[in-house]
From Swiss-Prot:
GO terms of biological process kind: L-proline biosynthetic process
Catalysed reactions, semicolon-separated: L-proline + NADP(+) = (S)-1-pyrroline-5-carboxylate + NADPH + 2 H(+); L-proline + NAD(+) = (S)-1-pyrroline-5-carboxylate + NADH + 2 H(+)
Record InterPro entries: 6-PGluconate_DH-like_C_sf, NAD(P)-bd_dom_sf, P5C_Rdtase_cat_N, P5CR-like_CS, P5CR_dimer, Pyrroline-COOH_reductase
Record-stated family: Belongs to the pyrroline-5-carboxylate reductase family.
HAMAP family attached to this UniProt entry: P5C_reductase
Recorded metabolic or biological pathway in which this protein acts: Amino-acid biosynthesis; L-proline biosynthesis; L-proline from L-glutamate 5-semialdehyde: step 1/1
Keyword Repeat in record: no
Name of encoding gene: proC
Enzyme class of the recorded protein, top EC level: oxidoreductase
Name of the molecule in the record: Pyrroline-5-carboxylate reductase
Length: 265
């Protein structure tokens, strides 16, 4: 398995933020010499060169020199790119939001090896959270190879495709909501007299430590809330206010609306 991974050559179509993030992760696993990228914005060539990654002038050349092709373009550009991959015989990974396997098969054909992945921005630091499904045309060896490749970028959840829009809202957009919460904590710290920089560090360390504690204890969050909350104490006063303002309901509706938007893409 590891020998197969080390000899893979991965092509990435679309060298935006996510394409760059995956290029960095994959290069750590495979070596930069086994990564090739392309983008319709030719200025991205300079960026690829700075990163030490080969830049292909077009999709066909990239596909001809890749065992796996990752499609990392905007949904509006999906048809144009997929048309250029109709003759490709390797594995196609798509991280395009809202572009189902069925839509891809209509362009590529039902015989193609298609894997749909929904990542989040945390891939950039190797801590991404990704959903994965495929159209059933991959062998077990190919499926394992793809999963091992992606695990170099974070954690992987194999789910039904019908849940992808919900996953997009929860994990794909989730980091932005977490960043907003951290910013709110930091601003609250400023209101209490800290500098923003110090308050941000305190908020960030608090969130990271809390997440680590919850993950290691593997309990319901409410159990840890109870450990922090003393009867008649300071924490319960804050919890009470959050509940009065509908904090949990607001977060739930935030995810619901984001999921509904994903369905419309």
């Amino acid at each position: 398995m590891h020998a197969i991974i080390l000899t893979m050559r991965v092509g990435i179509v679309g060298f935006g933020n996510m394409g760059q993030a995956f290029a960095l992760c994959f290069s750590k696993k495979l070596g930069k010499e086994n990564i090739i990228v392309t983008d319709k914005v030719q200025e991205k060539r300079n960026l690829a060169t700075e990163m030490g990654i080969a830049f292909a002038s077009d999709v066909k050349f990239l596909a001809d020199n890749s065992d796996v092709v990752l499609v990392a373009v905007k949904p509006k550009d999906s048809q144009e790119v997929l048309q250029k991959l109709k003759d490709y015989k390797g594995i196609i990974l798509s991280i395009m939001a809202g572009v189902s396997i069925e839509k891809m098969e209509k362009i590529l054909g039902k015989d193609k090896k298609i894997v749909r992945v929904m990542p989040n921005v945390n891939v950039a630091v190797g801590s991404g959270v990704m959903a994965i499904t495929d159209n059933g045309n991959l062998s077990e060896e190919e499926r394992s190879k793809v999963e091992e490749l992606l695990l170099s970028c974070g954690t992987l959840y194999r789910i039904e495709e019908r849940l992808f829009d919900a996953f997009t809202a929860l994990a794909g957009s989730g980091p932005a909501f977490v960043f907003s919460f951290i910013d709110a904590l930091a601003l609250a710290g400023v209101h209490q007299g800290f500098s923003y920089e110090q308050a941000l560090r305190i908020a960030l360390d608090t969130v990271m430590g809390s997440a680590k504690l919850l993950k290691e204890f593997q309990v319901n969050p409410n159990e840890l809330i109870a450990k922090v909350t003393s009867p008649g104490g300071t924490t319960i006063e804050g919890i009470k206010y959050l509940e009065e303002k509908g904090f949990k309901g607001t977060v739930m509706e935030c995810i619901n609306r984001t999921s509904q938007k994903a369905k419309k893409l």
